[in-house]
């Protein structure tokens, strides 16, 4: 049987793991980031964005597959709301949650009420067969596409998974809902075997994902610092420290030893999800960290010779002009080496999505027209704040950056895209609420 796994535009690590599981079971499996018609017996789409549910290329590939009598299954983070996936894309089934165990049975048996962790339509009714079993942390090698070395995700060819789950419960984030709040870690030996395989396949730069890197091997919410250091040391031994990043980290998950290890075994950057300078908004976001903890964490990173980047979310429902000003003030104060700005996106299955569904449109900054300084640009309030914050952050980086016309237009294009994508996602959410 021939199986094609497609992960649109970026081959995600999760898609490669599913490909590896199927290949190990003896199926003739291939993987690609190109969305195209296929002559495989089974098409598996690994989808990680709500935008994929509206993507005409994906709809066409599924239609083609079904018309020629092949089967099509969808999995990945979009499965948080299987009714949306079935309604928008009409695959034969959706793999809900972690798919490593479920996909094998689905491929072998086809959709059936006996397989836990799937959703499918039968005689006009949606059947959901409970939750998927958590996947074991030992697994076959991922199926690596031959062009992996050309892929670029925030500077890395691939983000590998060292553990699943996050002790945080941020209201906008899917990680604790998809993988749970208990951390399940892989063995260092397995991770290093995989890193060698990626290197052999042409990967130059690896990044560690998993919500918060330093939670690797943690138990009952307590960090296992020696294991994290050993992990970084091991991967750097294969790739070289200049080719490893361990970016995402919670401000309350650092120690001096963790920071020294990041400095010694990686490219030397830490990436904090700071989100807001307003305590009120951080509480609304369920961030579980305070602005003072952010200040302290940034200071400590600098003392350990690390560069610090921060991500911020604007346009969260309930964010007032004063809240937004506090975020601007914090950026000015911290003078971060890099800043990433996003408009709050209601990802299905998250508390933020529930919040967005519960408020009238006129209270959602994504729908409110901006009437201030950028009115002539025709932005929503959320887009205007994102645009303004990008410009503001450039002014307050340690290395002063002049915003020229090109950057101005890039930022404008970026916020318009974010705004329109989020409007489209919100419309889908509303349709299936
Ligand atoms: S700390 Fe990061 S991974 Fe964990 S819930 Fe918050 S945003 Fe998600």
Description of each model-found segment:
Residues 2-5, 196-308, 314-316:
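Conserved SAM/AdoMet-binding glycine-rich loop
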Residues 5, 9-10, 19, 325, ...:
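C-terminal accessory regions of radical SAM enzymes
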Residues 7, 18, 30-131, 343, ...:
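Glycine-rich beta-alpha loop elements in corrinoid/cobalamin-binding modules
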Residues 82, 168-171, 205-220, 280, ...:
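Flexible glycine/acidic-rich beta-alpha junction loops that bind and position SAM and/or redox cofactors
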Residues 82-89, 257-259, 317-333:
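Catalytic cores of alpha/beta
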Residues 112-115, 120-162, 205:
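N-terminal [4Fe-4S]-dependent radical SAM core
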Residues 118, 166, 170, 191, ...:
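Conserved, mostly hydrophobic/aromatic
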Residues 153-190, 197:
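Canonical Radical SAM [4Fe-4S] cluster-binding loop centered on the CxxxCxxC motif
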């Amino acid at each position: 049987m021939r199986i094609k796994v497609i992960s649109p535009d970026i081959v995600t690590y999760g898609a490669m793991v599913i490909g590896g599981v199927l290949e190990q079971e003896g199926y003739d499996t291939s993987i690609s980031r190109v969305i195209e018609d296929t002559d495989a017996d089974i098409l598996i789409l690994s989808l990680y964005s709500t935008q994929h549910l509206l993507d005409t290329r994906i709809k066409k590939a599924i239609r083609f597959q079904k018309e020629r009598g092949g089967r099509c299954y969808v999995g990945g983070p979009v499965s948080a709301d299987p009714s949306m996936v079935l309604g928008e894309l009409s695959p034969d089934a959706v793999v809900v949650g972690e798919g490593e165990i479920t996909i094998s049975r689905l491929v072998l048996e086809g959709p059936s009420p006996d397989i836990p962790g799937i959703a499918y339509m039968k005689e006009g009714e949606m059947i959901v067969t409970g939750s998927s079993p958590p996947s074991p942390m030992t697994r076959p090698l991922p199926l690596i596409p031959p062009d992996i070395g050309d892929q670029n995700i925030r500077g890395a060819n691939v983000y590998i998974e060292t553990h699943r789950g996050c002790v945080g419960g941020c209201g906008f984030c899917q990680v604790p809902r998809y993988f749970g709040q208990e951390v399940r870690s892989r063995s260092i030996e397995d991770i290093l075997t995989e890193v060698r395989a990626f290197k052999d396949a042409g990967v130059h730069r690896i990044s560690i994902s998993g919500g918060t890197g330093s939670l690797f091997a943690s138990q009952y919410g307590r960090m296992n610092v020696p294991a994290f250091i050993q992990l970084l040391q091991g991967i750097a031994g294969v790739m070289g420290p200049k080719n490893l990043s361990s970016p995402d980290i919670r401000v309350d998950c650092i120690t001096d030893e963790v920071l020294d290890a990041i400095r010694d075994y990686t490219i030397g950057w830490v990436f904090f999800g700071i989100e807001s300078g307003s305590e009120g908004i951080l509480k609304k976001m369920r961030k579980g960290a305070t602005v003072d903890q952010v200040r302290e964490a940034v200071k400590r990173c600098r003392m350990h010779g690390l560069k610090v980047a921060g991500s911020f979310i604007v346009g969260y429902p309930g964010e007032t002009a004063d809240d937004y000003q506090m975020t601007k003030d914090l950026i000015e104060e911290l003078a971060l080496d890099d800043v990433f700005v996003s408009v709050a996106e209601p990802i299905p299955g998250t508390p933020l999505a529930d919040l967005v569904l519960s408020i009238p449109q006129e209270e959602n900054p994504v729908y409110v027209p901006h009437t201030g300084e950028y009115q002539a640009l025709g932005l929503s309030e959320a887009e205007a704040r994102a645009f303004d914050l990008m410009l503001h952050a450039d002014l307050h980086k340690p290395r002063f950056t002049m915003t020229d016309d090109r950057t101005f237009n890039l930022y404008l294009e970026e916020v318009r895209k974010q705004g329109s994508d989020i409007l489209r996602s919100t419309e889908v959410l509303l349709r299936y609420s």
